[in-house]
């Protein structure tokens, strides 16, 4: 357990759970909105964790002390917003473990991470309320690396052997097939866009087929 920051903590359930389980020694729980932050304070107080969890009104990581921080969690928002939050403190994130859970725009976030000196260490997928999401573990290395279309789309999620990862990949395939259908039906078709969607859908089918084969062995 280390010292973490939960950005956009909402009701404060996550930092409370992390401290109670011993996964974190202490947490800084932040939110940009006073209402949710009041709820988080109440949750912390009801669990008797005021000594280990500090709550603070903040926009992303702006104005927060990052010295001694081991982990930063940014979950439950769009990939573009997560990238914007990180972009304002990039050079101070060396040695910090990032756990990022984009609700939307995951490909954008992966592209941004690769292009701004972050390495994606691993991904784990989760299904909640019938929707599948990826949780991205990343770290700042300073080395910018290429992010081809397939990697932007799936990241390291195929390495996750859990059932939720299969659901996540099937969701991505469904979206690509829907996108391809729309592109083909367009009054002014985009050949490059169609070719890319066809390629991504084919790759996703291959990944899913390989997973099924491995399961059957």
Set out the residue ranges of the language-model regions:
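Conserved class I S-adenosyl-L-methionine
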Residues: 1-10
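Short helix-capping segments at alpha-helix termini
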Residues: 22-23, 45-51, 91-93
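S-adenosyl-L-methionine
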Residues: 34, 38-67
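Conserved SAM-binding motif I beta-strand of class I
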Residues: 26-31
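Conserved SAM-binding loop of SAM-dependent methyltransferases across substrates and taxa
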Residues: 11-24
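Short glycine-rich anion-binding loops that position phosphate/pyrophosphate groups of nucleotides
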Residues: 10, 77-80
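Class I S-adenosyl-L-methionine
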Residues: 62-63, 68, 80-217
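Short SAM/SAH-binding signature in class I
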Residues: 69-76
């Amino acid at each position: 357990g280390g010292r973490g920051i939960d950005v956009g903590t909402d009701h404060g359930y996550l930092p409370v759970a992390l401290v109670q389980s011993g996964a974190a020694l202490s947490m800084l729980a932040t939110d940009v909105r006073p209402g949710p932050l009041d709820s988080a304070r109440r949750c912390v107080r009801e669990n008797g964790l005021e000594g280990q969890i500090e709550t603070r009104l903040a926009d992303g990581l702006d104005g927060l002390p990052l010295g001694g921080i081991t982990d930063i969690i940014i979950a439950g928002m769009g990939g573009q917003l997560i990238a914007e939050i990180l972009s304002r403190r990039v050079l101070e994130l060396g040695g910090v473990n990032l756990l990022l859970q984009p609700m939307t725009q995951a490909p954008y976030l992966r592209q941004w991470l690769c292009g701004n000196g972050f390495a994606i260490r691993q991904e784990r997928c989760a299904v909640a309320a019938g929707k599948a999401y990826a949780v991205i573990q990343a770290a700042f290395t300073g080395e910018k690396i290429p992010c081809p279309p397939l990697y932007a789309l799936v990241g390291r999620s195929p390495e996750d052997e859990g059932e939720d990862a299969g659901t996540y990949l099937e969701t991505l395939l469904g979206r690509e097939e829907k996108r391809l259908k729309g592109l083909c039906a367009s009054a002014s078709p985009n050949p490059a866009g169609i070719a890319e969607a066809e390629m991504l859908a084919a790759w996703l089918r291959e990944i899913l087929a390989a997973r099924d084969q491995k399961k059957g062995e």
